[in-house]
């Protein structure tokens, strides 16, 4: 896991949760979105990241950001969609904001279905 330039804290309490969904099995054209979460994490290891958001929040001080890793994308695609929904629901139950990386367009259905 990367620390996104120091912004990520591995705490049990968090109000923003990052998850990766390395899934591209339903892509109707090119594959590759499954590598998105890994690539974003690899590019986000340096301190050159600006912790300030457009809304004036400092991600290093005012929020607790946690990277929950990747959702298991093995097995049938319906099982994958179910695991995505379960993961998002757990994040929302904590009153946190989910930030989702990767996944082909079919993953969107799981996200808006909730």
Predicted feature locations:
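Helix-loop module immediately N-terminal to the HCX5R catalytic loop
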Residues: 78-89
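N-terminal glycine-rich anion-binding loop in soluble enzyme alpha/beta folds
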Residues: 1-78
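Short, well-ordered alpha-helical microsegments
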Residues: 108-109
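Glycine-rich beta-strand-to-loop/alpha-helix junction loops that act as flexible
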Residues: 102-104
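Residue-level preference for the first positions of well-ordered beta-strands
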Residues: 16, 97-98
